[in-house]
Structure formats: C-alpha cells, structure tokens
Amino acid sequence: DTYVSSSQPALALKARDLPLMGSTMGASRLTSSGAMGGLIVDSWITVYGKGDGVSPLAIVAHGEVPDGWYWDGIMRHPFSINEGVETIGGVSFQACTYVTSEKRDAFLPLEDPEGARILAQDGQPPRRWLARMFANRFDFDSDKIVLEYREPLPEDITSITALPLGRADYIAAFEQRAREAFAVETAGVPAAGIMQQRGIGALQWRYMDETFWGTVSPYDRMDWR
C-alpha cells in the first residue's frame, strides 16, 4: 500500500491508517500553462479511504512535467488558511487548509459517491469537504509530490475563517490529524508506479488541473545558457 516515487530523493509514501482504495497513472492537463491544448503532466495517483461519504480520504499524488517546464513555487489554494511549512518523516512540505470545490473536484466520486450522483443531477452535494494539502518540488522542480487529507466539514461550520462558538479548536485538531495521516520515508531506489495499480475509474481526470496541482512555467531560453 506504499507508493514509491521516481523523484530524487525517491520517497516512499502512504496513508497510515486508511485502507487502500486504488492506485492509477494517467495524464493531467494544465490548461493555463500557455501550451497548445494544455500541458500534459504524467501523474501517479493513489487514494486511501472507505469512500462512504463520511470517512476521511487521503491522497498521494506525484506529477512530473515535461522537459523545459518547472513547477512554480506557489503551492497554496485560493482562499486557503494556515499556510506554512510542515515536516513529515524528515521531509518538508508547504501546507495549507482549504474547502474543496463542490463542482470541480476530481475526487468527489471517490470520497462521496452519493454527493457525486446528486451533483450529476444538478443538485447540491449534501457535504462539503475540508482538506489539508502538503506539497513539495523535487528534481530541479520538475517533480511535485502532493499529499492531501480530507474530512467531511461539519454542517455547523459554514466558514473556516469564522468558526462557530465552541469550535475554536476544530481546525487545529483537523490539521493535527492530517499531519499524522501520512508516513513518508526516503526510499533506496526510485521507481514511480511500483505499486500495483488498482482501478479507481471514478477519478475525474478533467479536474486534475491547476486546481489540484498548482501552476507551471516554461524555462526561458536564457536559463539554459
């Protein structure tokens, strides 16, 4: 149930206490890159959780950009809070907390199949999801590792910047659970895709874009001189 990346250093990554739901590889498309038709990013995605709409979900994702491109250094989501640097297993990650999109979330059918069905019928999903993202770049910024932990947002919390009475410690407790959800170790041999793939066909690849990955930039020709 451990994903081993091809990045340098190679990392062995997994969720600690959640069942493996599936692992797959595919192509993400970054449409705001300026590349004709969008920039294709080789992507390895592993998902952990029960997928019952009420239990946590954990994501291990590895994206590799083509030669001539690099991941930008800004690794936060719009409207995110509590941005900072977290260390997991001796590896530093930029972290932030945010509420996932209800309509453009690649993982909604995996974490909440009922909510995805309701959304497909032009309804409103019954739950919102809170996420803590950890991200870092490797191999001269050509590889990006994203770890993300999610839980359903309690119904009484309508804003993560103005918590209701009695909920002052909720976000801090959630972020602690997120920090403890992942195991990260340095692996001896890089081997992207070493985990046997198990189908997670419900993953909505059309939303595996800048919303999840963040942005990229091309190297200027002067950078190569």
Residue ranges and their predicted role:
Residues 1-44, 156-225:
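N-terminal targeting sequences that direct proteins away from the cytosol to non-cytosolic compartments
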Residues 27-170:
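Conserved polar/disulfide-associated segments of primarily extracytoplasmic proteins
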